[in-house]
Amino acid sequence: MEHFNPILGSEPNGQKFITCGEIMLRLTPPNYEKIRMASAFEASYGGSEANIALALANLGVDSTFFSVVPNNSLGKSAVRWLRSNDVHCTPMILTEPDETPSNRLGTYYLETGYGIRASKVIYDRKHSAITEYDFSQVDLDALLEGYDWLHLSGITPALAPNCRSLILDMLKVAKKKGLTVSFDGNFRSTLWTWEEARDFCTECLPYVDVLLGIEPYHLWKDENDHSKGDWKDGVPLQPSYEQQDEIFQRFIERYPNLKCI
């Protein structure tokens, strides 16, 4: 039986997807060792948007990843890893030291949990190439040409002011070109404050078609008088169906461009 999706249509694999974000070197101690006890690390690569691109590619979807990495062995290895998983990397920018002073690839250390011990992540991503690149050099109209779907998250704009501008500009260009846009707020408290995240991510909402989650966004009861509160205030962490539905309806009333939450 064929199922029709109102966003994808009946042939989702005919869609061309592009995502944008930071890809990082992932270092993991083998055999569930703790980082402080490790004498060796297994190397791989990851990042929220890169993982989305990889997952889509593994499902047979035409998937492209856009990012900035240093033009050295680490950056080239990250690109090779993506390509080995059938992710297109044609738009990727490999930078020289005169373009991004630190010219480094972000890194994170993953301590894999075992039993009741939770996993642990340590990030070392400040001054990575993507946070220092001048994106005014990028022709976003040309970058998004030929794609049907753009996926972004709230992680990338939290990295640096230049990334914030990039994400908002990409959303505006994608909307103008008629791409379907999905956005995952994906709040990270180690990167910015709750209010900073809410302020920026709310700016993104007019350009989004598919919204993943209802935070971090402002949904003011009165746009001109914020003292009246947010429609989400007082909603429990485990809301009833009726409570969820009311919030969804409020979002759609405020942002009729939203096709799916």
What are these regions (language model features)?
Residues 51-62, 84:
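Alpha-helix C-terminal capping segments
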Residues 62, 66-154:
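Conserved N-terminal subdomain of the carbohydrate kinase-like
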Residues 191-261:
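Conserved phosphate/ATP/ADP-binding segment of small-molecule kinases
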Residues 36-46:
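Short pre-catalytic strand/loop immediately N-terminal to key active-site residues, enriched for Gly-Thr
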Residues 126, 155, 186-190, 216-217:
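Active-site beta-loop-alpha junctions enriched in small/polar residues
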Residues 1-35:
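Positively charged, low-complexity intrinsically disordered leader regions
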Residues 173-180, 255-259:
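A short helix->loop->beta-strand "cap" motif at the edges of active sites that frequently abuts
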Residues 166-178, 200-207:
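Catalytic-core regions built around general acid/base machinery
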